Amino acid sequence: HNNPYVTEFNRVVTEDYSLIKPDYTFHDLVSEVTGFTNMHTTQPTYSYYDHTAWLNAHHDPRRWCAYIFYLNDTWLTQWGGQLCLLNQDEITIKDSIEPFGNRLVIMDVSDLTGTRINKHFISPVSITADHPRYSLAGWFYQTETDGPSPVRNENAN
């Protein structure tokens, strides 16, 4: 993509991004927030949800942490496109997160308890939306050689 926002976000995710702590990376931030210390990531994917577009309810297999950064300059609730997190019954909605611009969502999708958590979906974008829903999404995961689960720092926030 030639979008400067996408280019800058890719730099932030893969390189140093702090002027105060030049060695503090996005990976360090996610590790600090989630408590997972041995995760890996790839470059984020750019998503474009046009009118009536949506994403089925799903889990993120072999992934431990997911993040979404919203790129919308403006977004109204009635336009849809919310990230919806399901309860353990995987039917009722536990939480709905608006895709407001400059919002970063980091969510645990790990399997440390033996059951998948945070099954989620994207609600349909309304035909009344002024523009598509734009976001960058990525995952922290573990390779097969890393062992059965990520290491969680019990002192994490």
Indicate residue ranges for each PLM-predicted region.
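A structural signal for the main folded, soluble domain(s) of proteins
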Residues: 3, 39-43, 54, 105, ...
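Short, conserved, surface-exposed binding loops centered on an aromatic residue
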Residues: 32-38, 56-61, 75
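Short, well-structured alpha-helical interface segments that form or flank functional binding sites
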Residues: 21, 25, 41, 62, ...
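Beta-rich nucleic-acid/ligand-interaction surfaces
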Residues: 48-56
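A short coil-to-beta-strand element that immediately follows conserved catalytic motifs
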Residues: 34-45, 79
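Catalytic core of Fe(II)/2-oxoglutarate
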Residues: 47, 60-63, 72-74, 78-157
